A protein has these predicted regions:
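Residue-level signal for inorganic ion chemistry
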Residues: 29, 65, 87, 109, ...
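Structural signal for hydrophobic packing residues in well-ordered secondary-structure cores
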Residues: 54, 58, 73-80, 84, ...
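Residues at or immediately preceding the N-termini of alpha-helices
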Residues: 26, 40-43, 62, 95, ...
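Conserved C-terminal structural/oligomerization subdomain of aldehyde/semialdehyde dehydrogenase
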Residues: 28-34, 218, 255, 306-309, ...
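N-terminal Rossmann-like NAD(P)+-binding subdomain of aldehyde/semialdehyde dehydrogenases
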Residues: 1-131, 324
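Rossmann-like NAD(P) dinucleotide-binding subdomain of oxidoreductase/dehydrogenase enzymes
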Residues: 121-264, 393, 458
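ALDH superfamily catalytic-core signature
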Residues: 220, 228-373, 436, 485-487, ...
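Short, well-ordered beta-strand elements within core beta-sheets of diverse protein domains
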Residues: 32-38, 52-59, 145, 254-257, ...
Length: 497
């Protein structure tokens, strides 16, 4: 059986592992590899290597860094088929979705190739006689990125291109079920010419995360995952003197107004709710149907959803793969069962789906629930599966209250042909990313990504301009170069008369 090791200092590294973690093929249920679990000693060694490498890397000119990022961008493009196949094998998502996440992740590499522009400082001439001020941004040092299983390529690429391009060293802690895309990324960075030790991959379980959070040699932490863990990351990291941004969970809502094109809305809702088997923080698990249009929306979504081909990710025409594990499947089925007991109408039931030849895989079909009570766990919790819950509201105002009452604020959308209502929604909804007739309002990489409320802990969003801010520290430099005319020193603030 294949053994998956760490990547430290530009090479594969075995170290002194605590044990192994099984890596499973979600479509077959079979264990395909054993992942070495890093020890505290492995982390200490990795941090030491990263700190030494960062000192050299920070002194590379911006032009040299940009050249390496350009090479890396091209290498990711050249190897996207290989990377996508690794993702399909471990995560289970269909091949086209795996290619799609790599392409979206590569957008951050695109942005990183212009880091010489993003790092331009500010300058003021003669703020006082003969005194100039300018600002510069310098790397924070060693950054750790802690990533979830659902996007093994894209979410790490939200982090490491900007962290590396701004002069930091990076330690990537991938999710244990999906480590291989991160290791291929490490190989590509080496081929691109990145100095050894600047990019490292260290795998493990929650003990590895805890070790990262308290390690004195790590200066900043980027995290994407569930909200309960995000709170731990934020609280522990900050209390140990680290810069932290922690992106938590989501329960994204879309309001469907009765004036909207319901066929258009249903088609996009289906793709957004069931793409990637619903295992994404920008999935659309909840629709708030206004003015009695709920049953129509449910039936129209059903028409599109029941046509989705579910199967093994490399299968021809497959549009949706399995969920990540048997445990995840059981939890999702339990939420559907509970919703049915509470009176929800099961418009489309995916609980009994099996895929011929993959009976041990963790498959569920798309499920559409209508008239879901607001106290049902399938509504209140982050489902992270192929389930759409439709709730009802009489008016736009009632629908907005429902959307804003939830603790999450990642992404929200509205379907309407009324520009006035749409504008009100964009201003009034409590979410960090908002779509008008766009169900997954994920911004491109030169904007920043992140939510509000329980969906984001910390002060900065990820990638884009806020990403550059997070991975750097500002320094204001005040200069005076005396000439023949000298200035007397005083004990007070210098000022012009």
């Amino acid at each position: 059986m294949k053994t998956i090791r760490q990547w430290v200092g530009g090479e594969y590294y075995e170290g002194s592992p605590l044990g192994v973690i099984p890596v499973e093929n979600s479509a077959t249920g079979e264990v395909t590899a054993e992942l070495l679990q890093a020890s505290k000693e492995d982390l200490d060694h990795t941090v030491e290597v990263a700190r030494d490498a960062q000192k050299e890397w920070a002194n590379y000119s911006l032009s040299k860094r940009v050249a390496i990022m350009f090479k890396m961008r091209q290498l990711v493009l050249d190897h996207q088929d290989e990377m996508a196949r690794l993702i399909v094998e471990e995560h289970g998502k269909n091949y086209s979705d795996a290619i799609g996440e790599i392409q979206r992740g590569r957008e951050t590499l695109d942005f990183a190739t212009a880091i010489n522009v993003a790092l331009k400082g500010e300058y003021s001439h003669d703020v006082s006689t003969g005194v100039d001020i300018h600002t510069t941004r310098q790397p924070v040092g060693v950054v750790a990125g802690i990533c979830p299983f659902n996007f093994p390529a894209m979410v790490p690429m939200w982090m490491h291109p900007l962290a590396v391009a701004t002069g930091n060293a990076f330690i990537l802690k991938p999710a244990s079920p999906t480590p291989s895309a991160s290791l291929l990324t490490a190989e590509l960075y080496k081929e691109a010419g990145l100095p050894d030790g600047v990019f490292n991959v260290l795998s493990g379980d929650r003990r590895s995360v805890q070790d990262i959070l308290v390690h004195s040699g790590i200066d900043a932490i980027s995290f994407v995952g569930s909200t309960p863990v995000a709170h731990i990351v934020q609280d522990t990291g900050v209390s140990h003197g680290k810069r932290v941004h922690a992106l938590g969970g989501a329960n994204n809502h879309a309001i469907v107004m009765p004036d909207s094109d319901l066929d258009f809305a249903a088609q996009h809702i289906s793709a957004s709710a069931f793409g990637a088997a619903g295992e994404r923080c920008m999935a659309l698990p909840v629709v708030v149907a206004v003015g009695g249009c709920g049953p129509q929306v449910a039936e129209k979504v059903k028409k599109y959803a029941e046509a989705i081909k579910v199967g093994e990710g490399m299968g021809e025409g497959v549009e949706m793969g399995p969920v990540i594990s048997a445990k995840a499947k059981d939890r999702i089925v339990g939420l559907i069962d509970d919703a049915e007991k509470r009176g929800s109408k099961v418009v489309l039931d995916g609980r009994g789906l099996t895929v011929p030849g993959y009976e041990n895989g963790h498959f569920l079909g798309p499920t559409v629930l209508d008239d879901v009570p607001l106290d049902a766990p399938v509504y209140t919790e982050e489902v992270f599966g192929p389930v759409l819950a439709i709730v009802h509201a009489d008016t736009y105002e009632e629908a907005l209250k429902i959307v804003n009452a939830q603790p999450f604020g990642n992404g929200s959308a509205i379907f309407t042909n009324d520009g006035g209502v749409a504008r009100r929604f964009t201003l009034d909804v409590e979410a960090g990313m908002v779509g008008v007739n766009v169900p997954i309002p994920t911004p491109v990489a030169f904007y920043s990504f992140g939510g509000w409320k329980e969906s984001l802990l910390g002060d900065t969003h990820i990638h884009g301009p806020e990403g550059v801010t997070f991975y750097t520290r500002a320094k204001a430099i005040t200069e005076r170069w005396p000439t023949e005319k000298t200035y007397a020193a005083t004990m007070s603030f210098q000022r012009e008369e």
